[in-house]
């Protein structure tokens, strides 16, 4: 476990798959500006060129060999994303972050099968990435929402994370690491995986879990929270969502009585987490556990 942050820190060496595309190029520049060590990019057929002074390679394998990268972020369209993820796994990268939305569920099942055979960790797909404020950002999280501190944040929602962290930052509560696991039904890293990392991380004093309706990820997290020594605050989005209607994320759908906000909030409360009723209550509850 790293001494200073989970998943990424100032020594993380990042390549951008799809760096010559609009999003890849734009976000590579923003990561560079933040201080992230973006050491290379990959676009088949564009090897030998440069983007913002970052060398571009034809394959991930070549990029890793030349740059000693340990992390990749993927900005490629959904129909190419599975191959891009597999290529990153095969190159032996420690962490693969996939921002791409709309990867078919069947492909995600193939990705999960492959994950069991490799040493890589996958964050996403359909996620905003990860930031250790003041150290490194791998993803598209807006810098100004975050400041360095000792609250670990893990979330299924992207924009909600930015809003909550901005509120925390304005209230003087900084974050150790903020992890967006993504809103798809089958994420790589899960709430439980990230909670384990925060539990072991010396810099993290408390954890905020931001969940949403649909699936059972929050209920599984609640089971793990029972054995955590660190205080956990939770917020669940989607309390007013109608059953049977997909809300924004593919994973955000209530089927029958499973996946409702009430069921998740009850499970988290029973596990000993402090559950914030509204967005505005999050700061109050976090402040309470950090005092």
Swiss-Prot record:
Enzyme Commission number, as recorded: 6.2.1.5
InterPro entries xref list: Cit_synth/succinyl-CoA_lig_AS, Citrt_syn/SCS-alpha_CS, CoA-bd, CoA_lig_alpha, NAD(P)-bd_dom_sf, SUCC_ACL_C, Succinyl-CoA_synth-like
Keyword set, alphabetical order: Ligase, Nucleotide-binding, Tricarboxylic acid cycle
Protein residues bound to substrate: 162
GO molecular function, one term: succinate-CoA ligase (GDP-forming) activity
GO cellular component: succinate-CoA ligase complex (ADP-forming)
Gene Ontology biological-process entries: tricarboxylic acid cycle
Chain residues that bind CoA: 20-23, 46, 99-101
Pathway entry: Carbohydrate metabolism; tricarboxylic acid cycle; succinate from succinyl-CoA (ligase route): step 1/1
Entry keyword annotation includes Nucleotide-binding: yes
Catalysed conversion reaction: succinate + ATP + CoA = succinyl-CoA + ADP + phosphate; GTP + succinate + CoA = succinyl-CoA + GDP + phosphate
Keyword Ligase part of the UniProt annotation: yes
Active site: 249 (tele-phosphohistidine intermediate)
Family, as annotated: Belongs to the succinate/malate CoA ligase alpha subunit family.
Quaternary structure, from the entry: Heterotetramer of two alpha and two beta subunits.
Function: Succinyl-CoA synthetase functions in the citric acid cycle (TCA), coupling the hydrolysis of succinyl-CoA to the synthesis of either ATP or GTP and thus represents the only step of substrate-level phosphorylation in the TCA. The alpha subunit of the enzyme binds the substrates coenzyme A and phosphate, while succinate binding and nucleotide specificity is provided by the beta subunit.
Name this polypeptide is given: Succinate--CoA ligase [ADP-forming] subunit alpha 1
Gene designation: sucD1
């Amino acid at each position: 476990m790293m001494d200073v942050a989970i998943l990424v820190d100032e020594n993380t060496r990042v390549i951008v798959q799809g760096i010559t595309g609009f999003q890849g190029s734009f976000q590579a520049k923003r990561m560079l500006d933040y201080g992230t060590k973006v050491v290379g990019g990959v676009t088949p057929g564009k090897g030998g060129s440069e983007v913002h002074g970052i060398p571009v390679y034809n394959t991930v394998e070549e990029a890793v060999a030349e740059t000693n990268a340990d992390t990749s972020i993927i900005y490629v369209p959904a129909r190419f994303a599975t191959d891009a993820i597999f290529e990153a796994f095969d190159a032996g990268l420690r962490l693969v972050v996939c921002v791409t939305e709309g990867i078919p569920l069947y492909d995600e099942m193939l990705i999960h099968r492959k994950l069991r055979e490799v040493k890589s960790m996958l964050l996403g797909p359909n996620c905003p990435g990860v930031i250790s404020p003041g150290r490194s950002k791998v993803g598209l999280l807006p810098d100004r929402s975050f400041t360095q501190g000792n609250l670990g944040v893990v979330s299924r929602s992207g924009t909600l994370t930015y809003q909550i962290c901005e509120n925390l930052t304005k209230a003087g509560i900084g974050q150790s690491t903020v992890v967006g696991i993504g809103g798809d039904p089958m994420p790589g890293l899960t709430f439980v995986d990230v909670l384990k990392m925060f539990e072991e991380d010396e810099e993290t004093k408390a954890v905020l879990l931001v969940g949403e309706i649909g699936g059972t990820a929050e209920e599984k997290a609640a089971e793990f929270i029972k054995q955590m020594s660190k205080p956990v605050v939770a917020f669940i989005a989607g309390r007013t969502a109608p059953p049977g209607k997909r809300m924004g994320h593919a994973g955000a759908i209530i089927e029958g009585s499973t996946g409702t906000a009430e069921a998740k909030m009850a499970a988290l409360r029973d596990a000993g987490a402090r559950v914030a009723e509204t967005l505005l209550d999050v700061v109050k509850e976090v402040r309470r556990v950090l005092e």
